[in-house]
Each structure stands twice: as C-alpha cells, then as structure tokens.
Curated annotation (Swiss-Prot):
Disulfide bonds: none annotated. GO terms for cellular component: cytoplasm; endopeptidase Clp complex. This is ATP-dependent Clp protease proteolytic subunit 1. HAMAP family: ClpP. Fourteen ClpP subunits assemble into 2 heptameric rings which stack back to back to give a disk-like structure with a central cavity, resembling the structure of eukaryotic proteasomes. Belongs to the peptidase S14 family. Its EC number is 3.4.21.92. Cleaves peptides in various proteins in a process that requires ATP hydrolysis. Has a chymotrypsin-like activity. Plays a major role in the degradation of misfolded proteins. The keyword Cytoplasm applies. One of its GO terms (biological process) is protein quality control for misfolded or incompletely synthesized proteins.
Length: 222
C-alpha cells in the first residue's frame, strides 16, 4: 500500500514551528452553592453555563467533536442567545476545521468569536467565520493565515496526482471561505497565503478577519 508523509486533511497546522504534543494544566474544581443545593464545578463548566466555548487546543477530530457537541447543546437550550468561542489555538486538521465551521454556520444562534493569544492557520478561519460584527481579538493577539502545508509525497504517480489535486481543491475552498468572511477577493487571498501571513489584532481588523479589537476592562490600562 502506498504511504504518504503528507496528509492535507491533517497537515493544516499553523505557526512557524511544528506543533508539539499537548499537555494539560490541571484545572481546579470548586463547590458552588445554588438555590438547588451545592455542585462541584470547574472553569470550563462555568464558561459553558455562560454559553462560552473555549477552543484552547489543536483542532483535531476529538476537539472538533467536543466543540460541535457544545454548540448543538447550547442551541437546544436557547436558540436565540449568542454562543461565544474564545480561541487560542495553533490550528490543526482541515476536515476537523470544516466540521466546526459548518456547524457554526448551521446553528441558529449568532456565533461570537474572540481571539486570545493566537488564532493560527485553521483557527484563524474559525475566528473569521464568526457572525459579522461579532468577531473580536484582544490587543496582543496573533493571527496567522497560510496555505495548507505539505511535507512531500511518495508513491505511485497516480496517487501523487490524486493528492496534488486534492490539496489544490482544499486550498481553493480555504481561499473562498476567507474571501467570503473578509470581503477580499479570492485572488488577493491566494497571493497572501502563499507564505505565512502574520497579523496583529489591529492588522486583522484592517484585513477583515475581526471586526474590532477589545479594549482592556481595567480602568488603569485604558
């Protein structure tokens, strides 16, 4: 069986360095008293209660399924209230990205997107894919867009041709989505993603990926 080092479905990873294995900070739990008694909580549970989904990992099938399940649940609870995605992600799988993106467009609630830290590669598409007028970034956020990455291929000539055609199809799909949400032409997007295009929060606003840069809430820092 032919083997490919490069998989366009899983190599849409962002950043200027390879993505390292993920490690998890141990989340604290706490007891919250309510009118119905006491319950054990953690920060993610509390965010979910406030209709906030935190995308703080690489985008793969597992994280995509979790994010989609949360969006569908929140739509079921209340289809008229916004859902907010906080994004701090280096990117990841293209098919996983598309699963989340399609769900964002499918559910009835508006989707607010907020970049904290970075939205690179696939994560930048999620950031741009939020509801127009409700896409934001914190002041020191880093946003990166680029073409789907390759690491070289080998195998039969017909297999290489199939994979080359597929990566071009994926690239065109990416360009079309970014053009739709930024208001720029497909041709301009195509030129810009030839190499890594790194944007500050203000540059991302000018480019059309976000609509506003959030000010700090501390009065002393305004």
């Amino acid at each position: 069986m032919s083997e490919f080092n490069f998989d366009p479905y899983r190599r849409y990873g962002g950043g200027m360095a390879p993505m390292a294995p993920q490690s998890r900070y141990v989340l604290p739990s706490y007891i919250e008293r309510t009118a119905y008694g006491v319950k054990e909580m953690n920060p993610y549970n509390k965010l979910f209660e406030e209709r906030i989904i935190f995308v703080g990992v690489q985008i793969d099938d597992t994280s995509a399924n979790d994010i989609i399940a949360q969006m569908m649940t929140l739509e079921h609870i209340d289809s008229d209230r916004d859902i907010t995605l906080y994004i701090n992600s280096p990117g990841g799988s293209f098919t996983s990205l598309m699963a989340i993106y399609d769900t964002m467009q499918f559910v009835r609630p508006d989707i607010q997107t907020v970049c904290v830290g970075q939205a690179a590669s696939a994560a930048a598409v999620l950031l741009a894919g939020g509801t127009k007028g409700k896409r934001t970034a914190l002041p020191n956020s880093r946003i990166l867009i680029h073409q789907p990455a390759t690491e070289g291929t080998h195998g039969q000539a017909s297999d290489v041709e199939i994979m080359a055609n597929e990566i071009m199809r994926i690239r065109h799909q990416l360009e079309t989505i970014l053009a739709k949400h930024t208001g720029r032409s497909v041709e301009e997007i195509s030129r810009d993603i030839e190499r890594d295009k790194i944007l500050t929060a203000e540059e991302a606003k000018e480019y059309g990926i976000v609509d506003d840069v959030l000010p700090y809430r501390k009065a002393s820092l305004k």
